[in-house]
Amino acid sequence: MATINQLVRKPRVKQVVKSNVPALAACPQKRGVCTRVYTTTPKKPNSALRKVCRVRLTNGFEVTSYIGGEGHNLQEHSVVLIRGGRVKDLPGVRYHTVRGALDCAGVNGRKKGRSKYGVKRPKS
């Protein structure tokens, strides 16, 4: 334990908290333009073709963003909204595209968990 005199001479250093989503710059979401839309394979125990896109954000960052849900309508030059949230089995993918916002359409035929995929309530 440090004495009061030692703390007066050299105070304790505050720990700096590093952000998991630096490209968002303390914003909840950011807008960007798709520069490349492609599929990639996940890490070892899993196997799939995960849909991802490279996005150039309005603040100049270029990030990789995951496209959730079954099927999508994104192409190069599509304007998308991205949010934070990593994909555990895709290294380097720390962002998700927001479905149902800007050029990214919601998921067709989605009945459950609709709010996460930009789907309006179905007519009953």
Curated annotation (Swiss-Prot):
GO biological process: translation
PTM-bearing positions, type 3-methylthioaspartic acid: D89
Protein name in UniProt: Small ribosomal subunit protein uS12
Subunit structure: Part of the 30S ribosomal subunit. Contacts proteins S8 and S17. May interact with IF1 in the 30S initiation complex.
Record has Transferase as a keyword: no
Function field: With S4 and S5 plays an important role in translational accuracy. Interacts with and stabilizes bases of the 16S rRNA that are involved in tRNA selection in the A site and with the mRNA backbone. Located at the interface of the 30S and 50S subunits, it traverses the body of the 30S subunit contacting proteins on the other side and probably holding the rRNA structure together. The combined cluster of proteins S8, S12 and S17 appears to hold together the shoulder and platform of the 30S subunit.
Gene: rpsL
Family stated for the protein in its record: Belongs to the universal ribosomal protein uS12 family.
SUPFAM superfamilies according to UniProt: Nucleic acid-binding proteins
Sorted UniProt keywords: Methylation, Ribonucleoprotein, Ribosomal protein, RNA-binding, rRNA-binding, tRNA-binding
InterPro entries (alphabetical): NA-bd_OB-fold, Ribosomal_uS12, Ribosomal_uS12_bac
